[in-house]
């Protein structure tokens, strides 16, 4: 059994404040440590434009005991030995991002592993930041491999809260840099941490507290997937979920559950589908010029979870129009807010998207238009996919015919 304790949530829900500034990509400064006092925190907030949000749908599980490193090293996709201060000659990082896979190589959940001060006996004590909707099943999965290992699992979801801090272009205030860790998933996503109520109040003094929905919007517009909706349990692959691009996979570490398929996919270099951000719009209207063109007043419902996104050739005279395969499903919608979202799409089709209203006939050659049905079951939404700027530029785009 895992124990639960109650604690008052220090981040009360506040009205969403959407502005173009908070949607722009941030320049993240490497993490450094500063002293923190109440006066410095107050000074931070005076000039800071940083945002702080409680991350929605995240739970916290403590893993402690002398076999913690060994157990998790065999279960997650990244090298957690980097967190083990007992075996390193240098200061270890405070956080590692990774994924849990089942034996078939399908992803179960994403996880942030946060290093905490060791137990009195010197054994590790780590906090797992995972989706609260899959927490029970993931704990059960870990226990299958725990066996007689000297490891204790404790649900601390009511004692600790997962928070994210970010800004458009400035260096993190000292309080944020000290209390949180750089989120490795993308250069613009910000800082992340698991904090107690008192620690959150300290960090909140150096930033503006915003609604969790604003963090979700920031994450989606930066093309960063997270949680149970974007990573359907036991049905998606870690590389399709961009775990490799988000520094969540170490291909040099030894075996772990699900490693064989992940390694084989990496070494063949063929990943046909990946999660990308989308902008939604209606036929007869111009597509958004940027993923950051967010419309909080978008009047239509977004698609249902895992709704099929289809593509069709824009030009009926193109060679593609004669091939039925070009009209097949392009991928599936995973999550969204307002008029933006994320979807796992075929890259070969993503690169062929074009604006059907373009006056240039050359731009329509072999080009595709993407559409998906709204949750109301009647409205057809057009979708414009985007390739995040932080993706590696030397990655090939495989054809649907590649073997």
Curated annotation (Swiss-Prot):
Keyword tags: Mitochondrion, Transit peptide
InterPro entries named among the record's database cross-references: TrmE/GcvT_dom1 (IPR027266), YgfZ/GcvT (IPR045179), YgfZ/GcvT_CS (IPR017703)
Matching Pfam families: Beta-barrel_CAF17_C
An individual GO BP term: iron-sulfur cluster assembly
Top-level taxon in the UniProt lineage: Eukaryota
GO molecular function, one term: transferase activity
Transit peptide stretch: 1-108
Matching Gene3D superfamilies: 2.40.30.160, Probable tRNA modification gtpase trme, domain 1
Locations listed in the record: Mitochondrion matrix
Any single Gene Ontology cellular-component annotation: mitochondrial matrix
NCBIfam families according to UniProt: ygfZ_signature (TIGR03317)
Similarity section: Belongs to the GcvT family. CAF17/IBA57 subfamily.
Protein name, entry field: Iron-sulfur cluster assembly factor IBA57 homolog, mitochondrial
Source organism of the structure: Mycosarcoma maydis (Corn smut fungus)
High-level lineage: Eukaryota, Fungi, Dikarya, Basidiomycota, Ustilaginomycotina
